[in-house]
Amino acid sequence: LIFAGRLSKEKGIEILLETASQLPNNYHLLIAGSGPLEEKVRKLSDEKTNLHYLGYQSKQNMLSLIRGSDLLIQPSLEEGISSTLLEAMACGTCVLGSDIEGISEVIENNKTGLLVEPNNSDELLNKILYLLPKKEKRLSMANEGLERVKKYDWKIVGKLYLNFYESLLNKSI
C-alpha cells in the first residue's frame, strides 16, 4: 500500500492514519510526502511496525515506489484531476480513492479502481481488506486503468483542469 502526496487535511492524511492504525500487521503502508501533518505521520510510524514514513521523494523514486506497490490510496477530501492517480494508473498500479469530483472523473468504480466515501476510515479499511487478497481483481483494474490513462494526454488534461476551475468559479458566483 502506498500514499504519495502532501501530508495535509485536504489530502485525507488524517483518515488514512486512522485507517492505518487498524491495518493488520502483515499489510504495510508506505507514506511518501511532506506537509503540515508530517509530525503526526512520523509519530504513528514510530508506533506501528507496518507503517513506513519515507518523507519527500524525488519523482523518479516516487514512480518506482508506486510501480512496486499493490495499491495506491488517495483518500482526499478535495482534489482536482489528480496527477498522482494518473501516474499510478500509468505505472500499472491499482488505485483506491475518495468518491469526490476530480478523483471520480479518473477512477471508474470497480473497473479502473475503487471509490470510497470521503472521510470514512471504516469504509476505506474495508475496501483495502477486500481488495488486497484479490490479486486478479487488482491486476484487472490496473490494466483497465492503464488503458484509461492513455486518453489523458496533456491537451485533454488541460481541458479537464479548465472545466474544473470554471465549475468552481460558477459555484462561487
Residue ranges and their predicted role:
Residues F3-Q22, L29, P36-E39, L114, ...:
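A conserved mid-protein helix/loop that constitutes part of the nucleotide-sugar donor-binding site
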Residues V41-Q57:
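Nucleotide-activated donor-binding/catalytic signature segment of Leloir-type glycosyltransferases, i.e.
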Residues Y56-Q57, S64-S69:
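Short alpha-helical donor nucleotide-sugar binding micro-motif in glycosyltransferases
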Residues L77:
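Aromatic "clamp/platform" in nucleotide-sugar-dependent glycosyltransferases that forms part
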Residues E87, I100-N110, L114-L115:
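Short acidic/histidine- and often glycine-rich active-site loop of Leloir-type glycosyltransferases
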Residues C94-G97:
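Short hydrophobic beta-strand element within catalytic cores of glycosyltransferases
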Residues N109-N110, L114-S121, Y130-K135:
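Conserved acidic donor-binding segment of nucleotide-sugar-dependent glycosyltransferases
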Residues E123, Y130, K137-K151, L160-N163, ...:
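A short, well-ordered alpha-helix in the C-terminal region of glycosyltransferases
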